[in-house]
Amino acid sequence: MTTSSPVRRAVGILRLAAGLVLAVALVFQIVEKVVNNDMIAEEYFSYFTIQASMVTIVVLLVGGFVALRLPVDTAPYTIARMSVVTYSVVTAVVYNALLRGIPDEGFVVTPWPGEIMHVWITVYLVLDWLFAPGRPALRWTALRIVIIYPLAWVAFTLVRGALTAWYPYPFLEPATGWLSVAAYVVGIAAFIVAVASLAIAYSQWRRPRSEEPMEPERIAQPTAT
């Protein structure tokens, strides 16, 4: 059975390190908010950034072990990886374009965990997608998977907001007008589809000529020697 190349093993170590750094940033922010009596768990864990960061930690740690053991990523893992790349890029753009600079209410958290979650982990994930070896090409059917979680999150957030009068982001507040809310939701959804489409197209463009794009249910098998 073919094992991982030295480059793949280096990629695995980098993924593990990135996952641990993101985990440290998230835990630090949680502990800081708890210590300063600023933690409202049901609100904190309702933020898209926080949920996506937790998923990203799992994907990076799993991907690290996959890269250390296998010469090629599996198709299901690659779809999960493409999804977190998409979510991270969209989160970074939305945060830096719409939310950066908005004053915090109450306790002001230490900034570096937020910078890791909204900037640096995105840079790493994009570079990993562009240059890490062992990524199978994905079919366009993978596109429908990446949009499921964001749509479910929006639906949950709007229903929860209607019941509690709390919304995690200003552009989702009905006080700005439902037309405005709808415009932001549709615009961000379109951006998610666009980013995911670019990621899938890149995976197909960079695949070896002999390799066919993989369906979500197919798993890449190591090559026998």
Where are these regions (language model features)?
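N-terminal membrane topogenic signal
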Residues: 2-18
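Non-cytosolic membrane-interface motifs at loop->transmembrane helix junctions
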Residues: 39-47, 76-79, 103-116, 140-143, ...
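Juxtamembrane "helix-exit" motif on the non-cytosolic side of transmembrane helices
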Residues: 29-38, 96-105
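Alpha-helical transmembrane segments in multipass membrane proteins, preferentially the mid-helix core
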Residues: 122-138
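Alpha-helical transmembrane segments of multi-pass membrane proteins
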Residues: 18-34
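Short, highly charged, low-complexity non-transmembrane loops/tails of multi-pass membrane proteins
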Residues: 206-225
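Interfacial segments of alpha-helical transmembrane regions
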Residues: 72-86, 142-147
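Membrane-interface transmembrane-helix boundary segments in multi-pass integral membrane proteins
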Residues: 45-46, 164-198, 219
